[in-house]
């Protein structure tokens, strides 16, 4: 191979790698930075939180919105699932999988209902299961909700829908965009990483929910 050919091949391979380099640059895992922890204190990281800050990780991702725009997203989760989430969201981004928004629930004052109504994908929030004294998997940073408005928690035979604003999406026999089903790419991806999907629960269906 001549010198010009070698140069052109090297240039081609370099240019080919740029999208992947840019993509990797949009994704990261780190300990929770001080500025982020200040946003969390008194909100998702409430007084009496039993999860040490050192056990949590701050995950930065890129995602495609419902309108097809590329946006930055941020997630706080337990360190045990941080790399899983990083890989999952990299795959979702490569597949141009639409996610409305990915913001810390602290932007909604850690109000789960407000976050769900805004169709916000989120993970850590130190709270109890509604109507129970048990800690939610979200309290441990081991659960994440994806596009929750379109994929509500349905219980009591459909009489109860959470968020209530998602009632139009409670009947899963209907066809509509962004519906999480067993055959959906996102669901398969989470399952491949060892997560359990709330859409498979027996006594209620939490279609937005993945936990480990």
Question: How does the language model describe each region?
Answer:
Residues 22, 51-56, 117-119, 137-139, ...:
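A generic structural signal for short, non-catalytic loop/turn and secondary-structure boundary residues
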């Amino acid at each position: 191979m001549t010198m010009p050919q070698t140069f052109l091949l090297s240039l081609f391979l370099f240019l080919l790698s740029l999208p992947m380099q840019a993509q990797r640059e949009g994704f990261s895992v780190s300990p929770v930075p001080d500025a982020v922890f200040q946003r969390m204190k008194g909100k998702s990281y409430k007084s009496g939180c039993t999860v040490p800050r050192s056990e949590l990780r701050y995950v930065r991702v890129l995602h495609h919105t419902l309108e097809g725009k590329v946006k930055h997203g941020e997630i706080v989760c337990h360190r045990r699932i941080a790399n899983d989430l990083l890989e999952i969201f990299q795959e979702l981004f490569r597949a141009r999988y639409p996610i409305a928004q990915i913001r810390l629930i602290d932007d909604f004052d850690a109000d789960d209902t407000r976050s769900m109504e805004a169709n916000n994908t989120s993970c850590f929030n130190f709270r109890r299961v509604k109507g129970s004294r048990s800690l939610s998997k979200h309290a441990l940073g081991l659960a994440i909700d994806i596009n929750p408005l379109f994929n509500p928690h349905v219980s009591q035979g459909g009489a109860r829908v959470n968020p209530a604003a998602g009632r139009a999406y409670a009947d899963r026999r209907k066809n509509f965009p962004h519906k999480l089903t067993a055959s959906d790419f996102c669901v398969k991806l989470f399952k491949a990483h060892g997560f359990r999907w709330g859409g498979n629960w027996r006594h209620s269906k939490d279609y937005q929910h993945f936990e480990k």
